C-alpha cells in the first residue's frame, strides 16, 4: 500500500512521459491537497514555460494521457491549469482495509543507512538539568523513527567523562571514601558531590595542588588514578540510568561513547591537520582558520585544536569523533542533537573534517535544540537562579498527573492510578517537547502540558483510552476486527484519508528530522476521529455491515495512534 500522494504522483509522471517524452517522466508532478478536490497536480504551471505552451494546454495534454480511472472518480482542470483529482471511495476503502493487517500501517522500509545519533550527553558527577531534556527526548524519538524506517541507528551518548575537573573529583572521592555516603550522592544527587569538591578546590590550596597533580596523573595513565576515575563514571551511570528509565528512553550503557573514548586519536588528529596545511600555530596554539568564518570585526575565527599549553579542547575531540564515526562506524549520516548555540562550532568542525577528507560521502547534520524557557521568557531556572533539576521536574509532572487521576478516577485501585499518572505525567513532558519545532524555544508550562484538550500528550492518550473503551464496551478485540471497510459518509471518508497519510508522515519526519510533524499528524487524526465518532454511530450502527466497517476504521485509528505515540516514546495507557 502506498499513500495517495505517492500513487497519484506516479500516475501523473507516467502521463508526463507519454505526453511530452521520456525526459519529462521524472518531473515533480507537484501533488498537493486541494480545497476543491482531494488533491491537485500543479505541474502544468511549472512546465508551461519550458514547453512554450499555456498551462491549461499542458494540463489538457496530461489528462489525455492520464491512466487513473481505477484510483480517481473525477479529474478536472481548473483555473489556469490546476488538475483536480478526486479519489474513488472504493479505492480509499480498499487501501484502508489493507492497513488492518499491516503492522507498518503503510510505512515503507527504506534502503538502510548507518546513522550514528549523538544525543543526551550529560556530564559525569553533574546533575542532569532541564537543558538535557530536549536533546534526550528529541534524539530518542529520531532514533526510534529512523529504526522503524529500516535504518541501522547507532546511538551515541557522548558523555563528559574527561577533563581538568576530574582532578578535584578524584581527590574528593579519596577524602570522603569510596564507600561513603558522600560518594553515594553521585547516584542520586551528583551536584552535591561536585559542589563539595569545588568548594574544597576554591578554599584549600593544598587540596587544589593535589587536584592539579591528579589531573596530570590521569592524563598520563596512572593505574590507580584511572581506577578511581572509572569509579566516578560507574557511580554516575547509576544516576544517568535512573533518569533514562524515568524518561522511558532507549539509551543504555552500551550506547556510552564519552569524550575519553577518543583520547588516543587527539594527537594524530592534530598532526594530520598540520601536515595537510589546515592547521597553523597562532599565539602558541594550533588552530584551523576557515574561509567564511569571521567575527564581528571581520577577523577570522579560529578553531583551536591544541592549546598553547599543549592541552586539547572540545574541537579536537569533536574532530576525532567525526573521523571515528565515518571510518569505524561507516556512517552515511551523522546526526548531532545538540543545542542551537553550538551551531557555529559544529559548522566549523564539519567544514574542517570535509577539507581534511574525512567525511567521504557521509553527511553530518546538526539538529538544533532550542532553549526551554520559564514564564518570564528567560531560560528556565529555579528561584535561586540554578538550572532546574531534571529528576525533580519529572517527579513533579507525575505528582501533578497523580492528583488529577485521583480526582477523576477514584474507582481505580491505587496501583492502576499510579501507573496511569506515570504514563500521563512523563508523556505530557515528552510530548510537549516534541510537538514544537526542535530549533525553537518554548515556555515550560505544566498546566498546558497536562491539559486534556489541545495538541498535548494527555489529549492523545485520552483519545486512545476512549477508543479502547469502545471495544471493551462492545466486547470486541480490535486485533480481530476484519471489516470490510466501506466509505459512504463524509466523516468516514475524512478519517480514511487521514489514516492513509501516516506512512508518508513518518517518511517526512525521517527526511526532515522534525518529530513535531508526527505530533501534528496524530493530533489531526485524533480530532478527525472525534468528528467521525460524533457523526457516525459505531456500536449502534443500524446495519451489521456498517457497524463492521466503522469498527474497522476505529481499529486502524487505534493502531495508528498507538504506533505514532510509540515512535515518539510516549506510552498509551489502557484507560484514563
Swiss-Prot record:
Self-association and partners: Monomer.
Name of protein: Arginine--tRNA ligase
Subcellular location: Cytoplasm
GO terms assigned for molecular function: arginine-tRNA ligase activity; ATP binding
Organism, scientific name: Thermobifida fusca (strain YX)
Intervals of motif 'HIGH' region: 122-132
CDD domains xrefs: Anticodon_Ia_Arg (cd07956), ArgRS_core (cd00671)
SUPFAM superfamilies reported for this sequence: Anticodon-binding domain of a subclass of class I aminoacyl-tRNA synthetases (SSF47323), Arginyl-tRNA synthetase (ArgRS), N-terminal 'additional' domain (SSF55190), Nucleotidylyl transferase (SSF52374)
Disulfide bonds: none
UniProt family annotation: Belongs to the class-I aminoacyl-tRNA synthetase family.
Claim: Signal is one of the keywords in the record: no
NCBIfam families the record matches: argS
InterPro entries xref list: aa-tRNA-synth_I_CS, Arg-tRNA-ligase, Arg-tRNA-synth_N, Arg-tRNA-synth_N_sf, ArgRS_core, DALR_anticod-bd, Rossmann-like_a/b/a_fold, tRNAsynth_Ia_anticodon-bd
GO cellular component terms attached to this protein's record: cytoplasm
Principal localisation: cytoplasm
Protein EC: 6.1.1.19
Keywords: Aminoacyl-tRNA synthetase, ATP-binding, Cytoplasm, Ligase, Nucleotide-binding, Protein biosynthesis
Biological processes annotated in GO: arginyl-tRNA aminoacylation
Pfam families registered for this protein in UniProt: Arg_tRNA_synt_N, DALR_1, tRNA-synt_1d
Swiss-Prot/TrEMBL catalytic activity: tRNA(Arg) + L-arginine + ATP = L-arginyl-tRNA(Arg) + AMP + diphosphate
Amino acid at each position: 500500500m502506498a499513500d495517495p500522494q505517492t500513487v497519484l504522483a506516479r500516475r501523473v509522471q507516467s502521463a508526463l512521459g507519454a505526453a511530452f517524452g521520456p525526459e519529462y517522466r521524472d518531473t515533480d508532478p507537484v501533488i498537493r491537497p486541494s480545497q476543491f478536490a482531494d488533491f491537485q497536480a500543479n505541474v502544468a504551471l511549472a512546465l508551461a514555460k519550458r514547453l512554450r505552451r499555456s498551462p491549461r494546454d499542458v494540463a489538457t495534454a496530461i489528462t489525455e494521457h492520464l491512466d487513473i480511472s481505477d484510483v480517481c472518480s473525477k479529474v478536472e482542470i481548473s483555473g489556469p491549469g490546476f488538475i483536480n483529482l478526486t479519489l474513488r471511495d472504493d479505492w480509499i476503502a480498499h487501501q484502508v482495509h489493507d492497513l488492518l493487517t499491516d503492522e507498518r500501517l503503510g510505512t515503507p522500509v527504506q534502503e538502510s543507512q548507518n546513522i550514528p545519533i549523538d544525543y543526551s550527553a550529560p556530564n559525569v558527577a553533574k546533575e542532569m538539568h532541564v537543558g538535557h531534556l530536549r536533546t534526550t527526548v528529541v534524539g530518542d524519538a529520531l532514533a526510534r523513527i529512523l529504526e522503524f524506517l529500516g535504518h541501522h541507528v547507532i546511538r551515541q551518548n557522548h558523555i563528559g567523562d574527561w577533563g581538568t575537573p576530574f582532578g578535584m573529583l578524584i581527590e574528593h572521592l579519596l577524602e570522603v571514601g569510596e564507600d561513603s555516603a558522600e560518594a553515594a550522592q553521585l547516584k542520586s544527587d551528583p551536584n552535591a558531590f561536585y559542589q563539595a569538591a569545588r568548594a574544597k578546590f576554591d578554599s584549600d590550596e593544598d587540596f587544589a595542588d593535589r587536584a592539579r597533580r591528579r589531573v596530570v596523573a590521569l592524563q598520563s595513565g596512572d593505574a590507580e588514578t584511572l581506577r578511581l576515575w572509572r569509579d566516578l563514571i560507574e557511580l554516575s551511570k547509576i544516576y544517568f540510568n535512573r533518569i533514562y528509565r524515568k524518561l522511558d528512553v532507549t539509551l543504555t550503557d552500551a550506547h556510552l561513547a564519552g569524550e575519553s573514548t577518543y583520547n588516543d586519536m587527539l594527537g594524530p588528529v592534530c598532526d594530520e591537520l598540520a601536515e595537510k596545511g589546515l592547521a597553523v600555530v597562532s599565539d602558541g596554539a594550533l588552530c584551523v582558520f576557515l574561509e567564511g568564518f569571521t567575527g564581528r570585526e571581520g577577523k577570522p575565527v579560529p578553531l583551536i585544536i591544541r592549546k598553547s599549553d599543549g592541552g586539547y579542547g572540545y574541537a579536537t575531540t569533536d574532530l576525532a569523533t567525526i573521523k571515528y564515526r565515518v571510518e569505524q562506524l561507516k556512517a552515511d549520516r551523522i546526526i548531532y542533537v545538540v543545542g542551537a548555540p553550538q551551531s557555529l562550532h559544529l559548522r566549523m568542525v564539519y567544514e574542517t573534517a570535509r577539507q581534511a577528507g574525512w567525511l567521504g560521502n557521509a553527511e553530518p547534520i546538526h539538529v538544533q535544540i532550542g532553549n526551554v524557557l520559564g514564564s518570564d521568557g528567560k531560560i528556565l531556572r529555579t528561584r535561586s537562579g540554578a538550572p532546574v533539576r531534571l529528576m525533580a521536574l519529572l517527579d513533579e509532572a507525575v505528582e501533578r498527573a497523580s492528583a488529577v487521576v485521583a480526582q477523576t478516577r477514584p474507582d481505580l485501585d491505587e496501583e492502576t492510578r499510579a501507573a496511569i499518572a506515570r504514563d500521563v505525567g512523563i508523556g505530557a513532558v515528552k510530548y510537549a517537547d516534541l510537538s514544537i519545532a526542535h530549533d525553537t524555544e518554548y515556555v515550560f508550562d505544566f498546566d498546558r502540558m497536562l491539559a486534556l484538550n489541545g495538541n498535548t500528550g494527555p489529549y492523545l492518550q485520552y483519545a486512545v483510552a476512549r477508543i479502547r473503551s469502545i471495544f471493551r464496551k462492545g466486547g470486541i478485540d480490535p486485533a480481530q476486527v476484519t471489516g470490510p471497510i466501506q466509505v459512504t459518509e463524509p466523516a468516514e471518508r475524512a478519517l480514511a484519508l487521514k489514516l492513509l497519510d501516516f506512512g508518508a508522515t513518518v517518511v517526512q519526519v525521517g527526511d526532515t528530522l522534525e518529530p513535531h510533524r508526527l505530533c501534528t499528524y496524530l493530533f489531526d487524526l485524533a480530532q478527525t476521529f472525534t468528528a467521525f465518532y460524533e457523526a457516525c454511530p459505531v456500536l449502534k450502527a443500524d446495519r451489521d455491515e456498517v457497524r463492521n466497517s466503522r469498527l474497522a476504521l476505529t481499529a486502524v485509528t487505534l493502531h495508528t495512534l498507538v504506533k505514532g505515540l510509540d515512535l515518539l516514546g510516549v506510552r498509551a495507557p489502557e484507560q484514563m
